Amino acid sequence: MATTNSSAAPVIDARKTSILARFAPTSNVTTEQYDETIRRLEKSGDWLPEGLEYHVAFKSDGKFRVSEIWDSREQFDAFGERLMPVLKDVGIEPGKPEMLEIHNIIKR
């Protein structure tokens, strides 16, 4: 994966394959459920998890969505084991995430 910013040449780390995880929950998630999930993760010390580079939460077509960039699939999976009980407890059915290998990230 190459990482580019406007003031330097691309930095390429062939050892690292970042991933994009896109969630479209199967249940109708409210902002209150989302905020409660983050609050519980912070309280337990599980937020921000190692390997999470970006977390973006938004609504699209009236449905709550989350997209994340992770350093590795292994870190994503490890956090998922801690996250799933919290989601279940607050009533969120996350569905199966779409997982995509990242080719490039460009930052300003």
Mark where each language-model region is.
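Short S/T/G/P-rich N-terminal loop/turn motif that feeds into the first structured element of a domain
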Residues: M1-S67, D71-P85, E93-R108
